[in-house]
Amino acid sequence: MSRKPPKKSDMGKSWMKPRRDSRQMISPEYHLIVSEGTKTEPTYFEKIKETIDAKYRDRIHLDISGKGDNTVNLFNRAVKDVARSNNVYKHVWLVFDKDDFPAENFDHTVELCEAESTEETRYHPIWSNQCIELWFLLHFMFLQSDLHRDEYWPKLTECLKSRNLGIYYKNRTDMFDVLRPYMDDAIRNAKMLEEINTGRTPSKSAPGTMVHYLIRTLKPYL
């Protein structure tokens, strides 16, 4: 039996139009985390990546890269990585410490991130003054004293031991899991420091850290 062609009067009606496949694939949002350190920071963020990948791999994708470089050089290497990558990174997070690097380089890196940012790719300067261990310590306490980076280790160990969580040592692989229950406290304490440091350059914001911006962005997936 031959099939009759549709009537002209029926053409254009909604029930005559082909159905669209509602199962359209949505590409995940790509993030690149580039750190100055090659072990402590990548280990911490790799654990975050594992946690996110377990449930949200199709919604957000993290690439982690520890460069072993600092401030301006770290920024330049991140820009090159973005240009060479097949992925279109929506967010590029530069994680770096003040340590003993010149103040002008530290502050200039923040300025470079702002200047390089576009609607397509946003560069975020996730600095800590003096070091990322400040972010770790803020999970347990609010700290306003400007300590040398070497003084954070014993303080972290004291806080960890008081909670039967062992001691702190560089490149401890379970730091994210250990700190995770106190994440909201760390975010609150970091925001308080940011308010105190209002009007100061990053190099003068001691202590201070921007890690909470990255964690707050990823928190819905953790």
Annotate each language-model stretch with its function.
Residues I33-E36:
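Short hydrophobic beta-strand that contains or immediately precedes a catalytic carboxylate
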Residues M1-Y30, P42, E46-S65, D81-W93, ...:
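C-terminal accessory helical subdomains adjacent to catalytic cores in phosphodiester-
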Residues K39:
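Short polar catalytic/cofactor-binding loops
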